[in-house]
Amino acid sequence: MNDQAQLLPGTLDLLILRAVSLGPLHGYGILLRIGQISGNALLIEQGALYHGLFRLVRQGLLKASWGTSENNRRAKFYSLTAAGRKRLREETDSWNRLATAIASALSQQPEEA
């Protein structure tokens, strides 16, 4: 059995926003940051990541600008916009409520038949 968790639909954007909220990053840095903040339980495929980044920039939740990476290569860096910070807060609150509800439901003991 694979120890890495499968992403639930709708979580990729939230994870990208969270990773970038800790500071501007290029795409590969975002992949590494998501792995780091999830204890390496979540690994995102590059294709999915770049589709997500494009979508978030188009929605005005991320801003992209060119810069130089730590290995002196030209890279596109992503940072949160004000709208991105707002969305991150809203989605985090929503996921926390959902996680609490699911944990509560799973902790209930089944009735004896």
Which stretches of residues belong to each language-model region?
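A cross-family signal for key residues in well-ordered alpha-helices
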Residues: R18, L32, H51, R89, ...
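Accessory beta->alpha helical hairpin/"wing" motif in late/C-terminal subdomains of nucleic-acid enzymes
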Residues: L80-G84
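Intrinsically disordered, low-complexity serine/threonine- and proline-rich regulatory segments
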Residues: M1-L7, E91
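Basic amphipathic alpha-helical segments that dock to polyanions
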Residues: L49-L56
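Amphipathic alpha-helical dimerization/coiled-coil segments
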Residues: K86-A113
